[in-house]
Swiss-Prot record:
Gene: lpxK
Keywords: ATP-binding, Kinase, Lipid A biosynthesis, Lipid biosynthesis, Lipid metabolism, Nucleotide-binding, Transferase
Gene Ontology MF terms: ATP binding; tetraacyldisaccharide 4'-kinase activity
Pfam families: LpxK (PF02606)
Name by which UniProt lists this protein: Tetraacyldisaccharide 4'-kinase
Gene Ontology terms describing biological process: lipid A biosynthetic process; lipopolysaccharide core region biosynthetic process
Pathway, per record: Glycolipid biosynthesis; lipid IV(A) biosynthesis; lipid IV(A) from (3R)-3-hydroxytetradecanoyl-[acyl-carrier-protein] and UDP-N-acetyl-alpha-D-glucosamine: step 6/6
Keyword Transferase: yes
Taxonomic path: Bacteria, Pseudomonadati, Pseudomonadota, Gammaproteobacteria, Moraxellales
Functional note: Transfers the gamma-phosphate of ATP to the 4'-position of a tetraacyldisaccharide 1-phosphate intermediate (termed DS-1-P) to form tetraacyldisaccharide 1,4'-bis-phosphate (lipid IVA).
InterPro entries, A to Z: LpxK (IPR003758), P-loop_NTPase (IPR027417)
NCBIfam families named in the record: lpxK (TIGR00682)
C-alpha cells in the first residue's frame, strides 16, 4: 500500500494519528496564503483571457462530481447557442506533448482521462496543458469565435484570472476533520466558499433541501444543488463492433440482486459503490487510486461476476482493450484468446447524468448576462441528457 492510499483511507476514517501532521498543515496554510496574496498584489503575474472564464473546482482532494457538472453545463450552454470551450490541466496525460487540443480520437495517456470523457460526451472544443494560459491560447488559436471558457479544476490556479467561480462540494463526504492538507483533505479553508457559488452535490431526495450543515459557509443566494442520476448500464467493450468482427460476444446486463465487481479509480470511489448498492447489486468493491492506469492483469483478476466501472475509468479501459486487441490479432493471426473474450463479455459501465436545481440555471443566466453573453430565454431543462 502506497502513502497516497494510506493517507486517503486515514482521511476517510478521520484517523487520530493525522493530527500529528498538523504542523505541516500550518506550514501549507501559510504558504498558500502568501501565494494567493502575491497574486492579488501583482507580485506574481496572472493571465486575463480575452473572453470570460468560468472556473469549476473544489476545495477538497478527491472526487466531488465536478466532471459530470461540467458536462451538464457544456451541454446546456450548447443548447442555448453559446460557443463554449473547456481547458484542463490534462492530469494523467503526457505533459511533454502539451499544450494539445482534445478530440474524439484523443487517448487518455496523452491528454488525460477526464478531458477524453468530456469531449466524447459533448464534442466541446477543448485544450489541455498544466499551464492554463498555454491551454487557453492554444484553444483560442483554433477556435477564435468562442464566447466562454470553462476551466476544469482551476480553482487554485491563481495565475488564471476568472470571471465566475463555482465550487463543487460533496455533501455526503463533507469536509472530514475540516483541516488543510495533509492533516485533512482540504486544499483551501472552508472560508473559501464565501467568495463563490457553491454547488452541493447531494442525494436525489435532498435536491431541494436548504437544511444542510454547511450553509453558514456561503450566502444563501450563492448556494446551489445537484445530484447524479445513474443511467442504464452499457457495454464497455463490444468485440463485434470494435475489433472488425473478429469475435462476437453476446452478454446480458447484470440484473438487480446479482453479485458484481465494482472497479473504480476515481477520487471518491465510495460514492460509486454506494450507487451500485442502491441500485440493488451485491457489490464487491475494488478501489484504486484516482486516475489509475488499469492493466489487463488487474481486470482478469476479477473472475466469474460482471465488472462495472465508471465512465471515467471506462475511457482508459477501452483504450487498453483496443491496444490489446491490436496486439493479439497481430500475434495470433486474427484470433483473440478465450480469456480475453470472456473478460469483454463481463465489462459494463455505469453512466451518470448531473441533475441540476433550477437555481443553477438561474444563477448561470444572471452571470452570463452580467458578462454580456446572450442566452436563450426559453425554459431551462433541469435534467440534461
Amino acid at each position: 500500500m502506497n502513502i497516497e492510499t494510506t493517507i486517503t483511507r486515514a482521511w476517510q476514517r478521520q484517523a487520530a494519528w493525522l493530527w500529528l501532521l498538523l504542523p505541516v498543515s500550518w506550514l501549507y496554510s501559510l504558504l498558500m496564503i502568501l501565494r494567493r496574496q502575491a497574486y492579488k498584489a501583482g507580485i506574481f503575474s496572472s493571465y486575463r483571457a480575452p473572453i470570460p472564464v468560468m472556473v469549476i473546482g473544489n476545495i477538497t482532494v478527491g472526487g466531488s462530481g465536478k466532471t459530470p457538472l461540467i458536462i451538464a453545463l457544456v451541454r446546456h450552454l450548447q443548447q442555448q447557442g453559446i460557443k463554449v470551450g473547456v481547458i484542463s490541466r490534462g492530469y494523467g496525460g503526457d505533459s511533454s506533448q502539451m499544450p494539445a487540443l482534445v478530440n474524439t480520437e484523443s487517448v487518455p495517456n496523452i491528454v488525460g482521462d477526464e478531458p477524453c470523457l468530456i469531449v466524447n460526451m459533448t464534442g466541446v472544443a477543448m485544450a489541455v496543458c498544466p499551464n492554463r494560459q498555454q491551454a487557453m491560447t492554444t484553444l483560442l488559436a483554433s477556435y477564435p469565435d468562442l464566447q466562454l471558457i470553462i476551466a476544469d479544476d482551476g480553482l487554485q490556479h491563481y495565475a488564471l484570472q476568472r470571471d465566475i467561480e463555482w465550487i463543487v462540494v460533496d455533501a455526503a463526504r463533507g469536509f472530514g476533520n475540516k483541516q488543510l492538507l495533509p492533516t485533512g483533505f482540504l486544499r483551501e479553508p472552508m472560508s473559501r466558499l464565501k467568495g463563490a457559488n457553491v454547488v452541493y452535490h447531494q442525494k436525489a431526495d435532498s435536491l431541494s433541501s436548504t437544511d444542510d450543515k454547511y450553509d453558514d459557509t456561503c450566502p444563501p443566494t450563492k448556494r446551489l444543488r445537484m445530484h447524479l442520476q445513474p443511467d442504464n448500464l452499457e457495454r464497455l467493450w463490444s468485440f463485434d463492433t470494435q475489433s472488425d468482427g473478429l469475435a462476437t460476444v453476446k452478454a446480458m446486463a447484470p440484473e438487480k440482486g446479482s453479485r458484481v465487481h465494482a472497479v473504480s479509480g476515481i477520487g471518491y470511489p465510495q460514492r460509486f459503490f454506494d450507487t451500485l448498492d442502491t441500485l440493488g447489486f451485491q457489490v464487491s468493491p475494488h478501489p484504486y487510486p484516482d486516475h489509475h492506469d488499469f492493466s489487463l492483469t488487474e481486470l482478469l483478476r476479477y473472475t466469474e461476476h460482471p465488472i462495472i466501472v465508471t465512465s471515467k475509468d471506462a475511457v482508459k479501459i477501452r483504450a487498453l482493450l483496443m491496444q490489446e486487441t491490436i496486439n493479439q490479432t497481430n500475434q495470433t493471426n486474427q484470433t483473440l484468446s478465450d480469456e480475453y473474450n470472456e473478460l469483454g463479455s463481463r465489462l459494463w459501465v455505469l453512466p451518470v447524468t448531473a441533475v441540476l436545481s433550477d437555481g443553477c440555471y438561474e444563477i448561470l443566466q444572471q452571470q452570463l448576462q452580467t458578462l454580456n453573453i446572450a442566452i436563450s430565454s426559453k425554459e431551462h431543462e433541469r435534467v440534461i441528457t
